Amino acid sequence: MPEIDMKPRSRDVTDGIEATAARGMLRAVGMGDEDWAKPQIGVASSWSEITPCNLSLDRLAQGAKEGVHAGGGYPLQFGTISVSDGISMGHEGMHFSLVSREVIADSVETVMMAERLDGSVLLAGCDKSLPGMLMAAARLDLSSVFLYAGSIAPGWVKLSDGTEKEVTIIDAFEAVGACKAGTMSQEDLTRIEKAICPGEGACGGMYTANTMASVAEALGMSLPGSAAPPSADRRRDYFAHRSGEAVVNLIAEGITARDIMTKEAFENAISVVMAFGGSTNAVLHLLAIAREAEVDLQLSDFNRIADRVPHLGDLKPFGRFVMNDVDRVGGVPVVMKALLDAGLLHGDVMTVTGRTMRENLEAMDLAELDGTVIRKMDDPIHATGGISVLHGSLAPEGAVVKTAGFDLDVFEGPARVFERERAAMDALTEGLISKGDVIVIRYEGPKGGPGMREMLAITGAIKGAGLGKDVLLLTDGRFSGGTTGLCIGHMAPEAVDAGPVAFVRDGDRIRVDIAARTLDLLVDEAELAARREGWAPLPPRYTRGVLAKYAKLVHSAAEGAITG
């Protein structure tokens, strides 16, 4: 077996007389003669002070750097951006959320390539920073380890009537709807506002950040057991140190990201998402990460896996528990062990430990599924996975629904069509939405939005208004991991690309059949053909800046809304 080169790229900046200037620069940041033989490890962090999701990352980056030193490498820390979905929700800022995923992946690639770093520890806390980091790892195909910031503890609120309960940020969005509908006082709304975020960490339910942290662990890109501990828990510092050591070991063993992120690993990740009832955003992000890893992952793979993996997690937004509770009952490895024992995971895939997933799980002292937070395999919440991909005349390329929270098998009703989210929110506030309506929000897709905004503001308001189980919401945009209710997103083709959603009119009958996985517009083809005559999309909202660039490059949601 050929000898492993511990410095597959950094030799460009440390070896020979031509690297004299580069070595001089590196001496100025602390390196010396004894360090030139060490692999250089990029420690990339999306730390910021803008949101609690990322507050732990500066601390964890220091731990990762210490681990790199202990493993025999030399760490070099750099930063990238992060966008807070909780802050940017419901206004113009949400156009920039999904775009940030691409900026993160591109910026990490740029630094890693320009500075000739040999491997990376990638740290993230917010929704889009997790897939952005994993996309960068897959694209670069270097030795890489991902580390999650950890989730926030749930808040506790006492309302004016004496009621006390746990709350998360999603309760705030729903409380806004209740306040507007006159069913909650401004005083209670303020009490909830003050309680939802008691400290650092990402949103606490099985929303997008925790879903993608579970994905990273199931993919094998994070250390076993590292996804579930809360942000403030000092076990995270242990995992940070171990992650730094692990990346140097991966270089020594010649293991790179694509050795880990195989088709089987992606199937494992999908299985874990289905079992937890995770965020629909996982579909979009897994497609994009797989594309970077040159893995052929299709929407059909999600339905195939959902058919055999039961939904076990009684987790918010639809259930009762949060990620802290998952940690309390054993974390992601407990779920993976149960799925593996049931023959629902590939055990022989490689992981960042340098061992297979099966070997990792066998080395851990794991409890059985607790039966409450995570239901037993023979007593699932649903017999099939928590996400389905629909097809039909209204979504020929597909649409995504979180079946974990969809209480009806069939819903049929008249369309109420809105150009973008604001118009729908105004109609709801004015009391113009009725039970049985199918709300259609279009021109919110990857290109037409642009940016494929999340519709949490409108879905929270719908639930707060008491209509959460009585109206169906369809969009070519997407939904927050915290969205509840009858919601179908990612409709493709999107409106700006002349998808069928562009030609829906008020009063058209729309039918969704969850069991059959169909979504249909009940309008005959001759009528639709007449509507297409002379049609033109809405003009672009942005003609300059990052969103204008993004709109020109982005692909369909059915392909993960990639830009490459």
From Swiss-Prot:
GO BP annotations listed: isoleucine biosynthetic process; L-valine biosynthetic process
Annotated binding of [2Fe-2S] cluster, by residue: 53, 126, 203
Sites of N6-carboxylysine modification: 128
Lineage: superkingdom: Bacteria
Class of enzymatic activity (EC top level): lyase
Molecular function, one GO term: dihydroxy-acid dehydratase activity
Residues involved in Mg(2+) binding: 85, 127-128, 454
Protein purpose: Functions in the biosynthesis of branched-chain amino acids. Catalyzes the dehydration of (2R,3R)-2,3-dihydroxy-3-methylpentanoate (2,3-dihydroxy-3-methylvalerate) into 2-oxo-3-methylpentanoate (2-oxo-3-methylvalerate) and of (2R)-2,3-dihydroxy-3-methylbutanoate (2,3-dihydroxyisovalerate) into 2-oxo-3-methylbutanoate (2-oxoisovalerate), the penultimate precursor to L-isoleucine and L-valine, respectively.
The protein's assembly and partners: Homodimer.
Name of the protein: Dihydroxy-acid dehydratase
Encoding gene per record: ilvD
